[in-house]
Every structure is written in C-alpha cells, then in structure tokens.
Amino acid sequence: RDELGDTLELVMRVYFEKPRTSIGWKGLIMDPDLDGSDNLAKGLRMARQLLCGVLDLGVPASTEFLDPITPQYIADLISWAAIGARTVESQTHRQMASGLSMPVGLKNATNGALTPVINALQAASHPQTFFGISAEGVASLVSTTGNPSAHMVLRGGEDGPNYDADSVATARAMLEKAD
C-alpha cells in the first residue's frame, strides 16, 4: 500500500454470501458451520469479527452484497461493495445499491453483456424508494438519494475476459451514450 497508495487502493476481498446458479453452500453468513444448519446469528457475528480483524490490520474491506438485508449488519465495516453478475438485473439489488454508503461496483452480466449493467448504473445512481429494513431493524419504506460512486466492473463473460483496451473503449462509449 505504501508503494502504490497515491494511485491505487488495495482492499481485502471478503465475500460472505455465495450466489448460487442452482443449489449449494450459500456462504459463511447463512451457514457458518458448513453443515446446512443455517445458523444466521453465528454467521453474522463471525462476519463482523472477521471484518473487524481486517480493519484492525489497516486494510479496507470489500464484499459482494447478495441478500438485501445483509448491509444492515455489516455495511459499517465495508469500504467497497459489489453487485454481482447474477443479480445486476435485479430491481431489488439496483435499489439497494442506490442506498449503500460506499462506492459500489456493478458487474456486467454473466454472458458478458453490458446493457444490463448500464441500466443498473442508471438506477443505482438515482434516488429510489422501496420496501426495506430501517436502521432500527423494522420493515419500512426506505428512500435513498442515489449512489454517486456507482461504477461498472468488467468481469468477463462467455467469450472470455473483457478488460482489454477495445472492450474498455466499447464500455466507455456505451456509458457516455447512456448519459
């Protein structure tokens, strides 16, 4: 971090939720004992303890938010968040991104398409109102101001990586056209 700190911020990727295409382990928060017991309270405690440990090392932490309730429990410890390729087209996740209090990267679709993430960026950067959880833990109407730090993450797709110069230029042109 000392060497690159003026141009690059290194963060620890700490993913607690596992998006599933079909079935399987859903991650530390949902199943910390890896046995299907779904001890959510234990998983949330473990996630917070791990994040506090990372922060105690002086390293910012990042995660992918999958369940829209999870940010209420760990967002205060997260410096950068992601909305994944499997959820970028979800209205729920776009609305959630609009209210996150940290920069959020929205990934292109699993097939590599950019239009879904461009649509998601427009939604995430604008005010939203939706059914959610208040700071007091009560179901309520949540209103956001939009996330001015929402941005695109090129994560590749069916045709391979998309972080080469041509792919980045295409993404940039599509973003400029959408504005």
How should each PLM-predicted stretch be described?
Residues 3-174:
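Active-site-facing alpha/beta catalytic cores
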Residues 1-2, 178-179:
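Short acidic catalytic loops
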